[in-house]
Amino acid sequence: MKNVLSAIQPTGDLHIGNYFGAVQNWVRLQESYNCVYGVVDYHTMTMPYKASDLLENTWKMTFQLLACGVKPENIFIQSLVPEHAELAWILSCVTSYGELTRMTQFKDKSKQLEDNDGKEAFVGAGLLFYPVLQAADILIYHADYVPVGKDQEQHLELSRSIAQRFNFQFGKEYFRHPEPLYTETPKILSPADPTRKMSKSLGEKHYINLLGDEDRTRKQIKSAVTDTGDTPAGQMSAGVLNLFEILRACNQMDAYDSLMADYHAGALKYSALKESVADALVELINPMRENYQALLADKRRVRDSIKDSSAVIRQRAQQTLREVRELSGLPAVK
C-alpha cells in the first residue's frame, strides 16, 4: 500500500473550506492508502502567535479531525516527533538560499507582516525555512503521494528537488520523490466576499466554522452575498455559484439539480437556494458535531491516544533519522 502524507496548521477551528478542500479527502484516502496526517504546530510558529493559543489550538484541531472521521492511529502532533526538526536542519544544508527566497508563500507572508507592521517588520528565519521543514515532514515518512492544492505545488516541487539533491550528494537513491495526489475538491469562497477564498484571516464574516453553532451557520448562509454587481451578462454571479458549490459538496444532488433548473429557467429564488444550502450543511455537520462533543467529554483518554499514536509514528521517523545520519556522516545516537 502506498504512503500518503498530509498536514494542517493548528490555527483554530476548522471551517467548511478546510473540510471540503482537504479533511473530507483525508478521511476517504484512509481506505486506500497508508496515511499519516500531521497537526504541524512547528509551522505555526513561523508567524506571530501566543504560546497559550498554540497549545489550545493544537488540541482543538486534533479533536476536530477525529470528529470528522480521521483515524486516531493516523494522526501525529509534529512537535511530539522532534526528528522532523533534525531532518529539516540536515536537508537545509542541501537547499539553496535562492530557492527559499523564490518561494511565493515566503514573499506573500513577508509582505503580510510588512503591511501590518511597516517596513521594519520582523520576518523570522523560520518563515524562510518553512519549506525545508515541510520537505522533512514529507520525506521522513517516505511518502509516495501528497494531496496538494495549487498553492502548495511549488513547495512539493522543492521537496522533490531536495530529495534528489540529498540522494545525489550521498550516493544513494534513499528518499523517494513524492508525487502530487490530485483529487476533485471544491473551492469554497467567502460568504461575505465570494471573490475571495474562504479564510479566517479575513475576519469572522468570511468563514463558516465547520463545527460551529447551527443558528450561526444558518444566519451566515442567509446573509451570504449573491449579487457581486460586476457579473457579465448571462453568467452566474460568484456568490450564487459559491452557494451551488457548497450544495454540491454536501452531496445534495437532487436539490442541486432542481435549483439549477430553476436558475436556467429564470425562476430561482435566492431564499430557496440559501435554505437548501443551510439545511445541507446542518445535515452534514450535525453527526460530526456530536462526535466532537463526545470526544471533548473524554479529553484525557483522547489526548493519551494521540500521544500514543504520535509515539508509534515517531518510531518510523527515528528509523529514517538513523539511516540519514549514517548516510550523511553523523555518529549514531546511542
What do these predicted ranges mean?
Residues 1-2, 300:
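A short, charged/proline- and glycine-enriched loop
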Residues 2-136, 293:
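N-terminal Rossmann-like or analogous alpha/beta NTP/dinucleotide-binding catalytic cores
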Residues 8-10, 41-43, 143-145, 202, ...:
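Short, histidine-centered active-site or binding-site loop motifs used for metal coordination
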Residues 16, 160-334:
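Conserved nucleotide- and phosphate/pyrophosphate-binding catalytic cores
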Residues 20, 52-55, 153-157, 211, ...:
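Short, conserved loop/turn and helix-capping segments at secondary-structure boundaries
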Residues 22, 87, 128-131, 155, ...:
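Catalytic-loop motifs flanking and including active-site residues across diverse enzymes
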Residues 97-102, 140-147, 251-259, 289:
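Short helix-capping/linker segments at secondary-structure and domain boundaries
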Residues 105-166, 170, 190:
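Internal, conserved structured core segments that host functional sites
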